[in-house]
Amino acid sequence: MEDSSLPVVPAPIAAPGPAPSATAPRVPFHCSECGKSFRYRSDLRRHFARHTALKPHACPRCGKGFKHSFNLANHLRSHTGERPYRCSACPKGFRDSTGLLHHQVVHTGEKPYCCLVCELRFSSRSSLGRHLKRQHRGTLPSPLQPSPGLPPLSSPCSVCCNVGPCSVCGGGGSSGGEGLEGAGATSWGLAEAAAAAAASLPPFACGACARRFDHGRELAAHWAAHTDVKPFKCPRCERDFNAPALLERHKLTHDLQGSNAPPTQVWASGGGPEVAGEGDASEVGAAPQTWDAGLLLSPTGAGVPKLEALLPGDEGSGNDQAPAAAAEASSEDTLYQCDCGTFFASAPALASHLEAHSGPATYGCGHCGALYAALAALEEHRRASHGEGSGEAAPDGEGNQAAGGPGPGSSSRSKKIFGCSECEKLFRSPRDLERHVLVHTGEKPFPCLECGKFFRHECYLKRHRLLHGTERPFPCHICGKGFITLSNLSRHLKLHRGMD
């Protein structure tokens, strides 16, 4: 017998829709409240529940109501403790398939969520949200409002709210100008969307380079790379860029130089420094591995002065005046970059670093086995990668003369010229700054494949992995029990001393 106290839910009415064209997909079920169209009657019934405040599916234990029966089924598992969705890599279980999918990212290392400003990727939506709030506060435009100068976006699809021609329902939306179709994109029909889904490919394809995207707004931003449109302008030097990531990378040059930076010095083919003008500065900064911050050198020596010419006072160089003039003109704000990405505050420091690229690798790291040609390069590697201070290292062969005194670049390594924009701390190298920034972003990019924990630095992960293994390098000489770290062994020995 039916309960008369329950309210009667009005049945959804299939409103008559517009006459379908020959190419339009068949969506015969229309909502009488908002006019949206659906391909199946079950989708229309599920959608119609949004227009009513009724939640007919109630939990028999806590009384909470749900609009759909499958939502109630998932909720009941919170009372029973049932976790039918098991992970194949670890013994963890989950109440629904969504939780299992989010967990599997821990084992696969996949990072499906990408920041559209700096192109960093994250494993969860919450991590991406924290990154956007901390690093790009107020810099992100509305998802449906393109930046000035970009090709105009179409308005959202009336069925699924996607921007541009819809890959789900085939709707074209109300175009604003040419929209995305004028941006070299192919058509977005149901056939293409189904083929892309079957091949696990994003549905939006660029007609110029065949690159695919998950959303129409990403395709619109990407299309600027194929055109002369550069809507992103640097507020300091008025240079234009066609992508926000390129603009953020360019801003680092101003941060490294400071607000009152000297003119850029570029070594020309003639051998002397030239002050680059506005047009030259734009050409230099266009290369992906060059910066507007100082002397541009290459370890191969092609088209640049020789290594001896960089050190002032050397005899036998064919052009002594040009390097000397460059050394006098350099200041504390001028940085010198090697092609490997390392910055130096002086030309002698860079010249000493270049020996690590050209000379024989005779100095070995006792931690990872990396070989270096110069002792200074080995000390920098041990300090940056393994957290050790400057110490003596025994070379594999002869040539330990550099261990007796500081190298040419030792004074520059003591300077802290790389600053954090969040807490204003200074660091000696870009690597140290990158490691420190992880404290502010909360990122932990090193996962443990055994238990799923994440760590901020690789050394922390290596130490944690000992927990899953049988190796215990620090044994107790009294009871024979082994420990992973020396600090744990010290605490254990205090127990023996307390029992004695």
Swiss-Prot record:
Residue stretches of biased makeup (Polar residues): 256-267
Q: Which Pfam families match?
A: zf-C2H2, zf-C2H2_15
Residues carrying N-acetylmethionine: 1
Q: Which Gene3D superfamilies match?
A: Classic Zinc Finger
Zinc fingers (C2H2-type) at which residues? 29-51, 57-79, 85-107, 113-136, 204-226, 232-254, 336-357, 363-386, 418-440, 446-468, 474-496
Task: Output the SMART domains linked to this UniProt entry.
Answer: ZnF_C2H2
State its location(s). Answer: Cytoplasm; Nucleus
What the entry lists under InterPro entries is as follows:
Krueppel_C2H2_ZnFinger, Znf-C2H2_ZIC1-5/GLI1-3-like, Znf_C2H2_sf, Znf_C2H2_type
Tissue distribution is: Widely expressed. In the retina, highest expression in the ganglion cell layer.
A Gene Ontology biological process in which this protein takes part is:
positive regulation of transcription by RNA polymerase II
Q: Name one GO molecular function term.
A: RNA polymerase II-specific DNA-binding transcription factor binding
For the region Disordered, give the residue spans.
1-24, 255-284, 306-328, 383-415
Q: Got a GO cellular component term for this one?
A: chromatin
Q: Where is the composition biased (Pro residues)?
A: 9-19
Q: Which UniProt keywords apply?
A: Acetylation, Cytoplasm, Metal-binding, Nucleus, Repeat, Repressor, Transcription, Transcription regulation, Zinc, Zinc-finger
Reported function: May be a transcriptional repressor of NRL function in photoreceptors. Does not repress CRX-mediated transactivation.
User: Which proteins does it associate with, and in what oligomeric form?
Assistant: Interacts with FLT3 cytoplasmic catalytic domain, following receptor stimulation, in a kinase-independent manner. Does not interact with other structurally related receptor tyrosine kinases, including KIT, CSF1R and PDGFR. Interacts with NRL.
PANTHER family in alphabetical order: IP01015P-RELATED (PTHR24377)
- Which named protein is this? Flt3-interacting zinc finger protein 1
Q: State the organism's lineage.
A: Eukaryota, Metazoa, Chordata, Craniata, Vertebrata
